[in-house]
C-alpha cells in the first residue's frame, strides 16, 4: 500500500471523475463497474472507492 509518483495523476483523475482513476489503476474490471455504479448513486462514494482502489493496488 505504498504511494508512488504514478498514483498522483490517478488521484487527480479520481477527484474529477472517479471511474477514470479506477480505470487507470485496474483497467476494465469489476472494480470499474462498481465505481461507475457508486459514482451514479453518489459522487462522494465514487471518490472514496476510487481512492481505496488506487491505494490498495
Curated annotation (Swiss-Prot):
PROSITE patterns: UPF0057 (PS01309). InterPro entries: PMP3 (IPR000612). Keywords: Membrane, Transmembrane, Transmembrane helix. Pfam families: Pmp3. The chain crosses the membrane at residues 3-23, 36-56. It is a multi-pass membrane protein. It is found in: Membrane. It comes from the Eukaryota. One of its GO terms (cellular component) is membrane. Coiled coil: none annotated. Belongs to the UPF0057 (PMP3) family. This is UPF0057 membrane protein T23F2.5.
Amino acid at each position: 500500500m505504498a504511494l508512488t509518483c504514478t498514483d498522483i495523476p490517478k488521484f487527480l483523475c479520481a477527484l474529477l471523475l472517479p471511474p477514470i482513476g479506477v480505470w487507470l489503476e485496474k483497467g476494465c474490471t469489476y472494480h470499474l463497474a462498481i465505481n461507475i455504479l457508486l459514482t451514479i448513486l453518489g459522487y462522494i462514494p465514487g471518490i472514496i472507492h476510487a481512492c481505496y482502489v488506487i491505494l490498495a493496488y
